[in-house]
Amino acid sequence: EVQLQQSGPELVKPGASVKMSCKASGYTFTDYYMKWVKQSHGKSLEWIGDINPNNGGTSYNQKFKGKATLTVDKSSSTAYMQLNSLTSEDSAVYYCARDRYWYFDVWGAGTTVTVSS
């Protein structure tokens, strides 16, 4: 069974950073790009960026450049996203999704990030 297992919820203070994970199983990790998506309450999904697990190449939505950093660990079939300098605007659910030619065919359950002092 193809699965993406995301790390648990995070409660962080303004100005801090957070790093979440997305562990892939059931397929060859390096065969598919991994996308990251933000779902803010009451808003539509926003594409953050994607990473090629084969070579670590990344592409970012301009809005999230400097905010998000995407990395992978091929040895554990895990993708990571670090978010920096957090503010209340970063409170959201963040999803990883396997990219099949811009059709996101497998999704993680999401990681909830709450930024609060």
Swiss-Prot record:
Any one GO BP annotation for this protein: immunoglobulin mediated immune response
Annotated GO MF terms: antigen binding
Keyword Disulfide bond applies: yes
Disulfide bonds: 22-96
GO cellular component, one term: immunoglobulin complex
Domain Ig-like: 1-116
Keywords of this entry: Adaptive immunity, Disulfide bond, Immunity, Immunoglobulin
Note: The sequences of 10 hybridoma proteins that also bind dextran differ from that shown at 1-7 positions, many of which occur in the D and J segments. This protein binds dextran.
Name assigned to this protein: Ig heavy chain V region J558
